């Protein structure tokens, strides 16, 4: 299903925050033959004229590179199709954040070896229990982290030191070896059904944590091998930005963020949840059925998604893919949402309304999907008037941006 929530990490086309707006406004733009005149739409106070954000990253270049690294880390279903339940992913912009996915004693190592940035993703073969943030003991679960360092020497040293620190957490920890990856550093605690691993690869350190239902060291090593194979293949397809150029990364080079309807265009800066552009793996990592999500993205020709202040816009390869993406997200919305009539004056829109089985404290009451040529906008609100204005505004902004 598509998680449609008020809080937490942004998941597939999910809004985190919606500003409260009311009133009516006029719409800039021009009529295009064969299309509606967007100047006739009621867009409230939302700005809908063509726009571009400042491209300078300022102090946020590392964060932008971390967002790019969402495509450098493998999804769990790429490791094994049974691991279809995505448990999310996260940018690791600094050592303090990275130790959420490593032993706490690792932070000085990351600082001393000048960690540049990282990314983490996890998944399992079953969903987490309701209200829990960890898999059950009978689940197979995997966490993959890629950490970048200034050079290959720093990465190699960091891998050795991270392994030494991790294995030193308990006197019962023991080293393991991989025949397939003899350079990998593996360890486990006999009788405990999980394994940790580190592998230096070029300027990266790959960190793994694999949980299995049974404490079998040979089985755990085989799963570590499987994960390393998939992750190395994924990393080979990623082109890191040269360290000297990270500060010069553009915030919105394809003007995709500028196509997302927002109440206020001021004071936006790169943020992994509230102001970012992601590729396909980010959406897959949040899916409860990763293979199905991957098929949808492939079938629709999905390219990228931009998130800005609670709304989002996805771009697909050609206009035929936009309704495919809309229908796929509608179908995966889950039982808490029912179809509702969409605004008749906005072509192609489909909307959902929260039903009695939903949680209004966590889920928005209304959500609409707005296709326009190669783009799909997604907007949410708890107010019926606002959702209609916001839907119209998203359509108008997409039309005016071409």
Model-derived regions, located:
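Hydrophobic, ordered structural segments
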Residues: 147-150, 162, 195-200, 204-247
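Bacterial N-terminal signal peptides that target proteins for export
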Residues: 1-12
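C-terminal motif of bacterial Sec signal peptides marking the signal peptidase cleavage site
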Residues: 19-23
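Short, surface-exposed beta-strand/loop micro-motifs that present aromatic residues
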Residues: 130-134, 194-199, 297-304, 364-372
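A short acidic-to-branched-hydrophobic micro-motif
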Residues: 116-156, 300-330
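Short Gly/Thr-rich strand-loop-strand
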Residues: 94-111, 138-141, 150-198, 320-366
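N-terminal "mature-domain start" segment
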Residues: 25-134, 221-307, 335-342, 390-402
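Hydrophobic, glycine-enriched assembly/anchoring segments
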Residues: 8, 364-402
């Amino acid at each position: 299903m598509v998680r449609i929530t008020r809080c937490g990490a942004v998941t597939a086309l999910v809004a985190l925050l919606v500003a409260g707006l009311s009133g009516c406004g006029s719409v800039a733009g021009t009529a295009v033959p064969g299309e509606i005149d967007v100047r006739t739409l009621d867009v409230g106070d939302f700005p809908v004229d063509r726009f571009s954000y400042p491209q300078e990253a300022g102090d946020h270049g590392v964060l932008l590179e971390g967002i790019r690294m969402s495509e450098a880390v493998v999804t769990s279903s790429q490791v094994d199709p049974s691991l279809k339940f995505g448990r999310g992913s996260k940018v690791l912009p600094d050592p303090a954040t990275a130790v959420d996915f490593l032993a706490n004693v690792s932070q000085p190592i990351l600082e001393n070896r000048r960690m540049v940035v990282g990314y983490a993703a996890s998944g399992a073969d079953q969903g987490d229990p309701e209200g829990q943030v960890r898999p059950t003991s009978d689940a197979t679960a995997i966490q993959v982290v890629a950490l970048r360092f200034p050079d290959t020497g720093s990465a190699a040293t960091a891998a050795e030191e991270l392994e030494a620190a991790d294995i030193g957490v308990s006197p019962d920890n023991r080293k393991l070896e991989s025949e397939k990856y003899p350079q990998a550093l593996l360890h486990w605690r006999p009788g405990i059904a999980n394994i940790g691993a580190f592998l230096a690869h070029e300027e990266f350190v790959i960190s793994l944590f694999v949980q299995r239902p049974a404490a079998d060291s040979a089985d755990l090593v085989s799963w570590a091998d499987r994960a390393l194979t998939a992750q190395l293949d994924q990393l080979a397809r990623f082109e890191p930005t040269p360290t000297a150029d990270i500060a010069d990364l553009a915030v919105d080079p394809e003007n995709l963020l500028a196509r997302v309807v927002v109440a206020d265009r001021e004071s936006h800066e790169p943020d992994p949840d509230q102001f970012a552009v992601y590729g396909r793996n980010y959406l897959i990592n949040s899916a409860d059925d990763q293979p199905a999500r991957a098929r949808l993205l492939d079938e629709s020709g999905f390219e990228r998604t931009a998130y800005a202040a609670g709304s989002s816009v996805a771009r697909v390869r050609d206009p035929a893919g936009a309704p495919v993406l809309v229908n796929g997200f509608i179908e995966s919305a889950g039982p808490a949402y029912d179809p509702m009539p969409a605004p008749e004056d906005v072509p192609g829109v489909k909307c959902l309304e929260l039903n009695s089985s939903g949680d209004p404290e966590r889920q928005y009451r209304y959500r609409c999907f707005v296709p326009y040529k190669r783009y799909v906008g997604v907007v949410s609100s708890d107010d019926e008037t606002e959702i209609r204005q916001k839907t119209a505004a998203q359509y108008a902004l997409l039309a005016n941006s071409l």
